[in-house]
Amino acid sequence: MRPVPGTCIFTRADLRDCGWSDAAVSRAIRSGRLLRHRRGLLSLPGRPGPQPATAAAVRACSGGVASHRSALLIHGLPVVGAPPPLPELTVAPRGVGGLHRAALYRASLPARDVTVVDDIPVTSIARTLVDVARHRPVTAAVAAIDAALHGRLVTMGELDDVMLRCWNWPRIRRAQRALRLVDARSESPLESVSRLVLSWLRLPTPDLQPVVLDESGRAVGRLDFYWDEFGVLGEADGRSKYDARAVLTAEKERQEQFEDLGLVVVRWGWEHATRRHNALRARLLSGFERGRLRDRSGFPRLWTL
């Protein structure tokens, strides 16, 4: 196959500059080696993520910038819940009108709030997170912000700067509430969502990410959640029964190590964190009761981050 431009999305003219003829482009489209988007825009098939559709929407929308959930995906941050059905763009308040196959938000976009990823204009990480916190459920916002803070992709100072500049925008109080709930120690979206759900269920507040040490002082592993008063550890497990056997075996061996140290292990997944809250509460309360009945004199030592 002939060389193609290094950008995510390109035109026939771009391909001609790379030595393609119009006939060759047409043949590649018919055979599926090139994908055709709106207004004559093209991309390679199989590119991971939503970039081709988003790039096509941005290119078709003068002054449009990828934002909100589309920006999360471009920045490699988690989207809790369904992915956006359409590319999400932000345009100037008096910018372009309705655009087919794109969801438009109208807002000011100073230069500091815009960056470029894979040749796509996109809102900065800090601006993206504040926008998501204003418009999406708190679970989605906190999971994305936790991931960015944990990965050191953004700082609280950068988020506060955007918040101050947007202090009078719609739904800014919603974003403020989300920012008060974030915790950079969470290592996965499921942990972030679970942390919120545990609070809503009025369960005791757990320690996050403590390291378990055995009698010799050797680190056995780090826990997602730990309730020291009960000797109970909580594992937010996003894996499924279809994951590789080696991974599942390693998880089982890890659980047995903790149980050998006298800990009660309670596991849950996305189903409990998103829909079966009462079942999660019952599972943890049962674990707390079992922990109360155990001899706690030999409990392992913990080192908290």
Name every feature range the model reports, one short phrase each:
Residues 1-173, 207, 288-305:
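Short gly/ser-rich loop at a beta-strand->alpha-helix junction or flexible surface loop bordering the NTP-binding
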Residues 6, 19, 112, 149-305:
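Surface segments flanking catalytic/ligand-binding clefts of nucleic-acid enzymes
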